[in-house]
Amino acid sequence: MPIKTIKIMVEGGNVKPGPPLAPTLSQLGLNVGEVVKKLNEATSSFKGMSVPVTIEVDSSTKKYEIKVGIPTTTALLLKEAGASEPSGDPAHKKIGNLSLEQVIKIAIMKKPGLTTKSLKAALKSMLGTAKSIGLTVDNRDPKELVKEVEEGKYDDLLAKYENEWNGVKE
C-alpha cells in the first residue's frame, strides 16, 4: 500500500477545485469535489490566510488523510492586527498594533513549528517578526519589549500562559 504525499499551500477556507490540486487528486483516483470540501472545512479557522496542508493518500485503497499545518508567523500577526500585508518600510511606516498577550497567544499557536523550547524564547521570536513587518506591540517598538522580556519584566505574565504552552504538543 504505497502512500503518496501531496504538500500544498492553500487559502484557508477557500480552496478551489482547479489546478494544480485537481489534476493531482484526479490522477490518484480521488473525488476532487469531496477532497476540496474537506480541505475547506479543515482550514476554515484560518480563513484568508495561506495554510500549509499535507494530504496523505493510500493509492491502493484511495483513503486519504488531511493534515493542516499552521500559517506563517507573519500571516498570524497580520490577521490579528487586521492588516492585509506587511509594511514596505517597517522602520517608518507602522501597519498596526498588538497587545503583548496577543503576541503570546500566537507564540503558543506556533509552538509545534518552532525550535525554541521556552515560551520566553518563542515570544522574542514573534516580537522580532512583528518588528520586521511594521507592527508595534503595546504601542511600542517590539525591539524594546525583547530587551524587557530578556530582563524578566514580563515573567509574571509569561507564567500565566506557561500551562497553555506546556499543553501544546510539539
Swiss-Prot record:
InterPro entries: Ribosomal_uL11 (IPR000911), Ribosomal_uL11_C (IPR020783), Ribosomal_uL11_C_sf (IPR036769), Ribosomal_uL11_CS (IPR020785), Ribosomal_uL11_N (IPR020784), Ribosomal_uL11_N_sf (IPR036796). One of its GO terms (molecular function) is structural constituent of ribosome. It holds the Pfam family Ribosomal_L11. The keyword rRNA-binding applies. The keyword Ribosomal protein applies. One of its GO terms (cellular component) is large ribosomal subunit. Keywords: Ribonucleoprotein, Ribosomal protein, RNA-binding, rRNA-binding. GO terms for biological process: translation. Forms part of the ribosomal stalk which helps the ribosome interact with GTP-bound translation factors. Belongs to the universal ribosomal protein uL11 family. HAMAP family: Ribosomal_uL11. This is Large ribosomal subunit protein uL11.
